[in-house]
Amino acid sequence: MRRYLIVAHKTLGGDHLIDHVRSLREEGPCRFLLLVPVQHPADHMWTEGEVTAAARRKLQEGLDRFHDEGIIADGEIGDANPVYAVSTVVRREGSGAFDGIVLSTLPPGPSRWLHLDVPSRMRREHPELPITHLVADRVAAH
């Protein structure tokens, strides 16, 4: 069974991502690991406990949406640096554990990850894995 690593935060559970996962499932059975990097807000003070709890809530919302759609998924939270978070998972699981990585971001402008060039950095860090970059048209409401 094919397995994909999905990396998202604000866009997790968005229709664009669910549609892509459905298209992957049309090609054959697959399962997914959702990785939600913690987010450090720039507009207010925060504690590590607060951002971890927020990431856990976002992960649970994503898992609930995937399960509601009949999609087999597990999940975890990761480091605030999404490239490092992915590298940690790939190192732990082994690069052969995944058939690909799906990275979901906000559009240019509001996307901090695009500003940091995360898609290109992730491709350089993991050339052995195909990386699909999806851009949401808005923050997931689910």
Describe these PLM feature segments.
Residues 1-47, 125, 133-136:
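Small/aliphatic-rich secondary-structure junction motif
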Residues 100, 125-142:
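Glycine-rich, aromatic-bearing surface loops/beta-hairpins
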Residues 46-56:
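Glycine- and acidic-residue-enriched helix-capping/strand-helix junction motifs
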Residues 70-98:
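Structural beta-alpha unit
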Residues 104-120:
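Glycine-rich, Arg-bearing micro-motifs that act as flexible, cationic patches
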Residues 2-8, 61-80:
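Acidic/glycine-enriched edge-of-secondary-structure segments
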